C-alpha cells in the first residue's frame, strides 16, 4: 500500500498549452503518498506535425519516471525509424532504449542527479567525488556515449515506472503503453480504451512470466511487483538467455494506432491513481460535464484530481499520486471543412469500448 502522510499534500502542478490543432491541460498532485513518484511530459510541438504526451508512474522511487519524462520523447524523434515514417517502431525502440540508457556509469550518474543524490555542480555523490571526463557528455538527444567510472558495471535501477504515451501526428494517434497507466479517447461522448493494463492475471503476461522463470503470488510477480510491463525494474530482467521482450517484466509496449476524426472530443492520459477511482466512462462523463462551464483544461484536470482524492486512508483508494493530461482536439472552422463526401470516416478498427 505504501507509506501515507497524516494529511494529504493537495498542492498541484498544473499547466496549459495550445497550438493550431489542439490544446491541453494537465494537473499532478502528490496526495496522501509520502513521496511524489509520478512524472509527465507534454510537448505540443515535438516536430512541426507532431505532439507528444506521456505519463510515467514510478514505483520504488521517482528516478525512472523522471528519466523517462526527460528522455523518452527525445529518443522517439531521434530514431531512424521515426525519420522514415515508422512511428510504431520508433516508439517501441524508445521504450527499450530507456532500459539501456539507465545502465553503466552514464546511466547511474543521470539517475543520481534525478534522484537528488548528486551535487550537480561538484559531482559529489554520497561522499565520493567523481566527474565525467571532458568530452564524455553530449547534449545531442540521440547520442549516449559510454563513460568510464566506478559504476561502469551498473545493471540499471531496481525501481521502475509505467509509461503511457500518446503521439499525435497529422490525423493519426499512436498510443504506446507499458504498465497500468491508461489512455482513453472520448468519441461522441463514448469512452474507448486505447491501452490495456498489464497485470499478472492476464494470460499472455502470466505465460511470459512463468517461461522466464518467475512465479505469481498474491497477484504479484515473485510476490513483489503487481505490474508485468514497466521501464526499469532491472532485477526482473536478468535472464541472460532471453531477449528483452521475453523477460519476466518487459518494457515492450502495446501500441495502438487509430485515425482521428471529427467525432473525437478529447483524449485523456492518466496514472492508475485516477483509474482506481473512476472508470473510463465515468471520467469521460465527468470531463464533459465540467467542460460545460469551464474552458481552462488544467482546471478541469484539477477538479478530476480533487474528485478522486480520498477523505482518509482507510481503504487506500484515492490515496495514490495522481497525474492526468487532457488533450482537446480543435474543430476546423466551417470555411475550412472538406466537402461532405470527402470527410474522413472513423477507423474500421475503432477502439474497443471500455467496460
Curated annotation (Swiss-Prot):
Cofactor note as given: Binds 2 magnesium or manganese ions per subunit.
One Gene Ontology term of the molecular function aspect: protein serine/threonine phosphatase activity
The reaction(s) this protein catalyses: O-phospho-L-seryl-[protein] + H2O = L-seryl-[protein] + phosphate; O-phospho-L-threonyl-[protein] + H2O = L-threonyl-[protein] + phosphate
Transmembrane segments: none
EC number(s) on file: 3.1.3.16
Pfam families linked: PP2C
Matches recorded under SMART domains: PP2C_SIG (SM00331), PP2Cc (SM00332)
Enzymatic class: hydrolase
Name recorded for this polypeptide: Probable protein phosphatase 2C 21
The gene coding this protein: PPC4-2
